[in-house]
Design a protein with these regions (language model features):
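A short, surface-exposed interaction/processing loop segment used at functional sites
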Residues: 126-145
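Short linker/helix segments within small regulatory modules
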Residues: 18-28, 95-112
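Short cysteine-rich clusters marking metal-coordination/redox-active sites
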Residues: 6-9, 31-34, 79-82, 115
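Residues immediately within or flanking Cys/His clusters that coordinate Zn2+
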Residues: 3-6, 28, 73-76, 112
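Short Cys/His-rich Zn2+-coordinating modules
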Residues: 11-19, 54-69, 95-102
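Short metal-binding segments enriched for Cys and/or His
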Residues: 32-53, 106-131
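Compact soluble domain cores
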Residues: 68-94
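Short, non-ligating residues that shape and space the ligands of small metal-coordination modules
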Residues: 15-16, 40-41, 85-89, 124-127
Length: 145
C-alpha cells in the first residue's frame, strides 16, 4: 500500500513509523533520511519531489499547488522605480486621527509592499488585491516569512 512507503524514496518505514513532510496542503509520508534531505528545500521543490515516484498522497492537490506557486511568481507586482519584485508586509490600518477621540474618524486598511532593491514603499487596497488568488498566495507567503 502506498501509505506504507516513503513518498520520496519508496522504501518501507523503519521500526519507528518515521514521519510526514508538509508539501503544500498535504502531508506526505517520509523516512527519516528523506526528511533530513527535504528540510532546506522550498515548498515548490518538495511538491515536485513528492510527485516523482507516483505514490504521493493526493497528487492532484500537489499539482494544483505547483501551478499556484509558479503562476503566482509571474503575478508578483514590480517596482515602478527600478522594476524589481515587490515584497508584501502585513496589512495595516492608516488612521487620520491617532487619538481616536471619535468613532467617526477616518481610517482605512492598506496592504504595504516594498522593493528590496531601491527601498520604494507602495500601498495597495487589500480588498482588491486579495481577489486575485495568485496575489493572495504571495501575500500569505510574504507575511509569514
Amino acid at each position: 500500500m502506498a501509505n506504507d512507503l516513503c513518498v520520496f524514496c519508496g522504501q518501507k518505514p523503519g521500526i519507528f513509523r518515521d514521519t510526514t513532510v508538509r508539501c503544500g496542503d498535504t502531508l506526505q509520508f517520509a523516512c527519516m533520511a528523506c526528511e533530513r534531505d527535504l528540510t532546506g528545500l522550498s515548498e515548490l521543490d518538495r511538491c515536485r519531489r513528492a510527485l516523482i515516484r507516483g505514490i504521493a498522497v493526493e497528487p492532484e492537490k500537489l499539482r494544483e499547488r505547483i501551478e499556484l506557486i509558479t503562476k503566482s511568481e509571474n503575478h508578483r507586482p514590480k517596482c515602478l522605480r527600478c522594476g524589481s519584485e515587490l515584497t508584501f508586509v502585513e496589512e495595516q490600518t492608516l488612521d487620520n486621527n491617532p487619538l481616536r477621540d471619535s468613532i467617526f474618524s477616518d481610517s482605512f486598511d492598506v496592504l504595504p509592499a516594498y522593493c528590496k532593491t531601491c527601498g520604494k514603499y507602495e500601498l495597495f487596497n487589500p480588498a482588491v488585491i486579495r481577489k486575485n488568488k495568485y496575489l493572495a498566495y504571495l501575500i500569505d507567503k510574504d507575511t509569514k516569512a
